[in-house]
Curated annotation (Swiss-Prot):
<protein>
    <recommendedName>
        <fullName>Holliday junction branch migration complex subunit RuvA</fullName>
    </recommendedName>
</protein>
<feature type="region of interest" description="Domain II">
    <location>
        <begin position="64"/>
        <end position="142"/>
    </location>
</feature>
<dbReference type="GO" id="GO:0005737">
    <property type="term" value="C:cytoplasm"/>
</dbReference>
<dbReference type="InterPro" id="IPR036267">
    <property type="entry name" value="RuvA_C_sf"/>
</dbReference>
<dbReference type="GO" id="GO:0006310">
    <property type="term" value="P:DNA recombination"/>
</dbReference>
<comment type="similarity">
    <text>Belongs to the RuvA family.</text>
</comment>
<dbReference type="InterPro" id="IPR010994">
    <property type="entry name" value="RuvA_2-like"/>
</dbReference>
<dbReference type="InterPro" id="IPR000085">
    <property type="entry name" value="RuvA"/>
</dbReference>
<dbReference type="GO" id="GO:0009378">
    <property type="term" value="F:four-way junction helicase activity"/>
</dbReference>
<feature type="region of interest" description="Domain III">
    <location>
        <begin position="153"/>
        <end position="201"/>
    </location>
</feature>
<dbReference type="Pfam" id="PF07499">
    <property type="entry name" value="RuvA_C"/>
</dbReference>
<keyword id="KW-0227">DNA damage</keyword>
<dbReference type="GO" id="GO:0000400">
    <property type="term" value="F:four-way junction DNA binding"/>
</dbReference>
<dbReference type="InterPro" id="IPR012340">
    <property type="entry name" value="NA-bd_OB-fold"/>
</dbReference>
<dbReference type="GO" id="GO:0009379">
    <property type="term" value="C:Holliday junction helicase complex"/>
</dbReference>
<dbReference type="Pfam" id="PF14520">
    <property type="entry name" value="HHH_5"/>
</dbReference>
<feature type="region of interest" description="Domain I">
    <location>
        <begin position="1"/>
        <end position="63"/>
    </location>
</feature>
Length: 201
């Protein structure tokens, strides 16, 4: 229904962003909303997919058509919902997911929250040979440089909220928090990416 939405990025939250266009604010769920942080209060184009449920109509948004395409593919797999698909794409690029599927790498797939061995096998069964490896869109690898701050700042707190929203448990987050506190991060996006790297390693 909505191929993409173009407008001003007016708000950022751990689970979603708000894009304002023609006086309407669209709430868009994203894999890692802080990747959009460098575009705050600027015009953006977000590739979207509308998911209709009995109790809600939800917009999901992505930085590239490749990422959107992988979300749509994952969402068709039995046992995979939008939340699990977002968690996978928050931690990996579309190409990394495609390579994992083509190589039948169940160990890689089961590192994501909500993905057990049965679901990993189903992903491979349903998608192997059906997704193409394409050149990665550089926008999926964006970094935002913000002001430096210590780890008692909201940066770490916001990053942990974003990881929790992706489905990671308190136990996993406690392990990640200790490791993140040992480093210095200049943005929430950087801290989220570091946390995801720890969680899927």
């Amino acid at each position: 229904m909505y191929a993409y939405i173009k407008g001003k990025l007016s708000q950022l939250f751990p689970t979603h962003v708000v894009v304002e266009t023609n006086g309407v604010g669209y709430e868009i769920q994203t894999p890692n909303s802080y990747r959009f942080q460098q575009y705050y209060q600027q015009e953006v184009t977000i590739y979207t997919s509308l998911v209709v449920r009995e109790d809600a109509q939800l917009l999901y948004g992505f930085m590239s058509e490749e990422e959107k395409g992988m979300f749509l593919s994952l969402n068709k797999v039995t046992g995979i919902g939008p939340k699990s698909a977002l968690a996978i794409l928050a931690a990996s690029t579309p190409n990394e997911v495609k390579i994992g599927i083509e190589n039948e790498n169940e160990t890689y797939l089961t590192k994501f929250p909500g993905i057990g061995k049965k679901t990993a096998r189903q992903i491979i069964l349903d998608l192997k040979g059906k997704v193409q490896i394409t050149e990665e869109n550089p926008e999926t690898l964006l970094n935002f440089e913000g002001s430096e701050s210590n780890q008692t700042s909201p940066i770490l707190d916001e990053a942990l909220l974003a990881l929790e929203a992706l489905g990671y448990s308190k136990r996993e987050l406690n392990k990640v928090e200790k490791k993140l506190q040992a480093e210095s991060y200049t943005s929430v996006d950087e801290a989220v990416k570091a946390g995801l790297k720890i969680l899927v390693s």
